[in-house]
Amino acid sequence: MVRKFDFLVIGSGIAGMSFALKVAHKGKVALICKSGLEEANTYFAQGGVASVTNLLVDNFDKHIEDTMIAGDWISDRGAVEKVVREAPAQIEELIKWGVDFDKNEKGEFDLHREGGHSEFRILHHKDNTGAEIQDSLIKAVQRHPNIEVIENQFAVEILTQHHLGVTVTRQTPDIKCYGAYILDPKTGKVDTYLAKVTLMATGGVGAVYKTTTNPLVATGDGIAICLLYTSPSP
């Protein structure tokens, strides 16, 4: 079966669901989850989310410096700056979608200070921030009329020009993505999902190791799928 959407989102953690919510006003979204929506690394994150919220005592430069030091200066500075400077706006988005960060008696964020941070800038929900974020985003995507959630199915291959009969290898220039093949493991059936935009938000690889605190779904299959069409670094 061939299904057509404006956006195909593969992965249902904070990255996948927040992207789906941001673009849903522009068209139909398919959100693919290889297990249940609750099972993602996001759900198991406890401490909180770091963001500059009080410019009287904190600033972006401090946060950027703290992050670079904690990463032993091997972090991509451009990426660090982007994440730090855009964090407050993303926090507002999470709140808009229903995330309830703890506040003090003054109605201000109850900020914590964690390892590597020079200031109090950790927003949290008790000690289960990830679960609060995941649960809130699940409710938001489930009530959005333009988002269709497909659980217990997963991507096995992305669609490139080979879908049009063109031979595609790692060396093919200007490889384009047209969607993905999605497998239903219960039936063994593979459906073709076509989309104008495809986002891979499949998380990490923790579960490929013998010892990990990651959930079993963190197998890195999304990374492996994309590597099929990525030229190795010189």
Question: What residue ranges belong to the model's regions?
Answer:
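Short hydrophobic core segments
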Residues: I10, L194-T202
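Alpha-helix C-terminal capping segments
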Residues: L21-K26, A201, L227-L228
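Core beta-strand elements of the Rossmann-like FAD/NAD(P) dinucleotide-binding domain
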Residues: R3-F5, K189-K196
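Extended, hydrophobic alpha-helical segments in both membrane/secreted and soluble proteins
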Residues: T198, A218-I225
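Conserved N-terminal/central alpha/beta ligand/cofactor-binding core
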Residues: K28, C33-Y178, L183-K189, A207
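N-terminal Rossmann-like FAD-binding beta1-loop-alpha1 element of flavoenzymes
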Residues: F7-A30
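Flavin (primarily FAD) binding-site architecture
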Residues: V205-T211
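Conserved small/polar residues in nucleotide/adenosyl-binding loops
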Residues: Y229-P234
